[in-house]
Amino acid sequence: MKLRLKVPQWHYSLLTDYERLAIFKNAIERVVDEDDVVFDLGTGSGILAMIAAKKAKKVYAIELDPFTYDYAKENIKVNGFNNIEIIEGDASTYNFKEKADVVIAELLDTALIIEPQVKVMNSIIERGFLKEDVKIIPAKAISTIQLVEAKMSHIYYDEDIKSEEVSEEVIYEEVDFHKTNPIEVSYNIELELEKSCENLGIKLRTYTILDDKHVAGQTSMLNPPLVIPLNKKVDKGRVKINLSYRRGGDLESIKVNLG
């Protein structure tokens, strides 16, 4: 599948994350049928909408940012997709003309803390825009927690800077996008700290379940591991943690307390 695309500068990294694009493409091509109505929520460059439109009867592609919307509109026109309706608007408030057979919503980030995936999907569900047998891509997100020796005193993504892992990695939440989910969350977690740490931190990872055949881990532009330092010296042994944050908020909403 060859497409001609123009994108804002900040979208180049998304388009060149081929691992991320490939797994979404594979899931979309597997899930979408020829009679389907598809919503692409937060369409960005429009690339996922165009992949869906190769098979779907109709695709509604919505983008909040007016600058990005202009690029998506041009991309869809240049590539000759007459079955895509491009919309400038907020997916959480826009009134769609019909219900969706398939929803694509790549509004993802680590632990769903910053991006509005949960808020948008809650709104679509609550306002009755989904058919009973709707297929959602991604279907779920699973997040894990692990203790680390933090390398910095502020929140950072554990990419170029690797933090020493000092506990097992455990699942602390599973979010199913077929149902409404809370915006404010709080978790009590107990982990075994394998060695004493000068600056204990927690590392969060998110694994994206696109459908029953496709699972995405971390890629260069999808859910990089996030480290939250506690800036405390903690001795080896059992560690009780309370982790809370606001989904679709910002990193400042994260609160971590030792029990």
From Swiss-Prot:
Superkingdom of origin organism: Archaea
Q: Could you tell me one molecular function GO term of this UniProt entry?
A: protein-arginine N-methyltransferase activity
Pfam family of the protein (one)? PrmA
Which family is this sequence assigned to? To M.thermoautotrophicum MTH738.
Q: What is this protein called?
A: Uncharacterized protein MJ1452
Q: Which organism does this record belong to? A: Methanocaldococcus jannaschii (strain ATCC 43067 / DSM 2661 / JAL-1 / JCM 10045 / NBRC 100440)
